[in-house]
UniProtKB/Swiss-Prot annotation:
Family: Belongs to the shikimate kinase family.
Keywords: Amino-acid biosynthesis, Aromatic amino acid biosynthesis, ATP-binding, Cytoplasm, Kinase, Magnesium, Metal-binding, Nucleotide-binding, Transferase
GO cellular component terms, semicolon-separated: cytosol
Binding annotation for Mg(2+): 22
Binding-site positions, substrate: 40, 64, 86, 143
PROSITE patterns: SHIKIMATE_KINASE (PS01128)
Name this polypeptide is given: Shikimate kinase
Species this protein is from: Chromobacterium violaceum (strain ATCC 12472 / DSM 30191 / JCM 1249 / CCUG 213 / NBRC 12614 / NCIMB 9131 / NCTC 9757 / MK)
C-alpha cells in the first residue's frame, strides 16, 4: 500500500470561497482513499434547498446554524475529507470541532485568483454585489486570522495545478506531526 494511503484521520479544508476546497478535497480524498464531503452540498442534500436560497429566506445566521450541525455530525466520522464553507471558521464552536477531530488544512489564494474563480458563480450569495473584489478583501481580512488559528498546514493554491498541489499536500501531511499515521 503506498504511503499516501497510510494517512489516517480526518482532513478538514478551510479557506475563502474559490480557494479550491471542493476541488482539492475531492482529489485528496481520491488520493488517500477517504470519503469526501462538502459541507454546503451536505446542507443542500439534507434540506433539499440551495445554499443561496437558504441565505435569502433564512439569513446567514440560520444558515450558519445548519452549517454547525453538519460540521459537528461529519467530524464524528472517521477518515473523511471535509471541504467546509468559507465562513465556517467564524463560529468558535466550529473551530474547536475541526481542530479537535482532524488535521486542518488552510487553502489560500490571491484575491485575483479568488475573484477569477468565483466571478461567474451565481451560487455565491455573499458575492452578488456591485464590488465583489472589495467583499473578498473584507472577508479575507476578517477570516484569515481564524483560518490561521486552527490550521495545521497552510498551502497556497494560487495558479496551481490540482494534481501537483495534492501531491505537495500529501507530502506535507506525511511529514506533519499534527496527524496520526496508521501503523501496520
Amino acid at each position: 500500500m503506498p504511503a499516501m494511503e497510510k494517512l489516517a484521520g480526518n482532513f478538514f479544508l478551510v479557506g475563502l470561497m474559490g480557494a479550491g476546497k471542493t476541488t482539492v478535497g475531492r482529489a485528496l480524498a481520491r488520493r488517500t482513499g477517504k470519503t469526501f464531503y462538502d459541507s454546503d452540498q451536505e446542507i443542500e442534500a439534507r434540506t433539499g434547498v440551495r445554499v443561496a436560497t437558504i441565505f435569502d429566506i433564512e439569513g446567514e445566521m440560520r444558515f450558519r446554524n445548519r452549517e454547525a450541525c453538519v460540521i459537528r455530525d461529519l467530524a464524528q466520522q472517521r477518515d473523511i475529507v471535509l471541504a467546509t464553507g468559507g465562513g465556517a471558521v467564524l463560529r468558535e464552536e466550529n473551530r474547536k470541532v475541526l481542530a479537535s477531530h482532524g488535521t486542518v488544512i488552510y487553502l489560500r489564494a490571491s484575491i485575483d485568483d479568488l475573484l477569477a474563480r468565483t466571478q461567474h458563480d451565481k451560487n455565491r450569495p455573499l458575492l452578488q454585489i456591485a464590488d465583489p473584489r472589495a467583499k473578498l478583501e473584507s472577508l479575507f481580512n476578517e477570516r484569515d486570522p481564524f483560518y490561521r488559528e486552527i490550521a495545521d498546514i497552510i498551502i497556497d493554491t494560487t495558479q496551481q495545478n490540482v494534481n501537483l498541489l495534492v501531491g505537495r499536500l500529501v507530502d506535507q501531511l506525511l511529514d506533519s506531526p499534527h496527524h496520526p499515521k496508521e501503523t501496520d
